[in-house]
Amino acid sequence: MKVLFFDCFAGIAGDMTVAAMVELGLPLEHLRRELARLGLPASTYELAVEPVRRKGVAASHFEVRVEQDQPHRHYADIAAMIDGSSLAATVKDKAQRIFRRIAEAEAKVHGMEIGHVHFHEVGAVDSIIDIVGAAIGLDYLGIEAVYVSPLPLGSGYIETAHGRLPVPAPATAELLKGLPVHGNIGSGERVTPTGAAIVAALGTAFGSHPPMEIRSIGYGAGSKDFADMPNLLRLVLGETAETLQRDEIVVLETNIDDMNPELLGFLMERLFEKGALDVTFSPLQMKKNRPGTLVTVITPCAKRDELARLILSESTAIGVRYYPAQRLILSRTVEERLTSLGPVKVKVVTDDALLRRVVPEFEECRRLTAEKGLPLMDVYRIVEREVAGT
């Protein structure tokens, strides 16, 4: 399996991503041809890749040279541009997912509906090219899984169309929710909204370098030259024989023997609402021969403290154990399939690109039960029979 590791030791931006992909083998002419499919007037921009050095390390710098006056675009305009282009479906999907994440973050920050989001910096031609260019690069390089290191937050302030904002900018901070970050780095903006959106939308797993046989390394340079370290993004391209995806998680545990069982159900609901990957309750026989409950929560690393606090606030627990763990998971996607009962979402589980099973989503089956007046078991059987092997 071909994998790509984003080593964001100094940060990440869209132009740095494309530059590093060029070093990995993405031909600039291929990038130009594919970007032309967007329908942007060729006279309004020019692509350039130049060799540079950052703190003595050779790298490439990608630049989109544009006319000074750039129109600002609504999210709907950009989505329509991508959808109406002749780009490959896989490229469209990646680009749409990235822009969708940015639009959701902007909508949250500005308190508006996503359809009303108006892009400033991200809506300019250079940002559109950075995002679509990254999608083109991943497709050209044949990347099957994207791994991402913890992201440096940076510090200080930046000037934007909305005025002077703290680092990370509000939209960037929103995009970083749920991702591992750290503050052990100097001042300045280290992660741009475009860079954050690329890894947030397309990252398979976040954490340490995955096991692989390294085939190639590319360095993409940012425009600034930081004093504390080279302003570079390192992309590591490799092959892995593993057909399973590797993921780093945290396991939270606590023992409870003095809580109303009805409240445990509410605790489980709240934990899932806040991003827990799984929650289980197991019976225990505790000290003084009391029956109790072992609460076990599997969570993304970035959610550890938030969910631990939730356990302490919504239960009688006065302490929570935690330990890091790794898991191997089969690839899974949620897809919509057409059945005699109507369209239904199913979970498609694959192993090394081979179909393993198609599993009906419970909430979808419950919806169809209410709509069709059929028993839940019958709905399950119909959906399983009609989507098997599709």
Swiss-Prot record:
It comes from the Bacteria. It holds the Pfam family Ni_insertion. The keyword Lyase does not apply. GO terms for molecular function: lyase activity; nickel cation binding. Keywords: Nickel. PANTHER family: NICKEL INSERTION PROTEIN-RELATED, PYRIDINIUM-3,5-BISTHIOCARBOXYLIC ACID MONONUCLEOTIDE NICKEL INSERTION PROTEIN. Belongs to the LarC family. This is Putative nickel insertion protein.
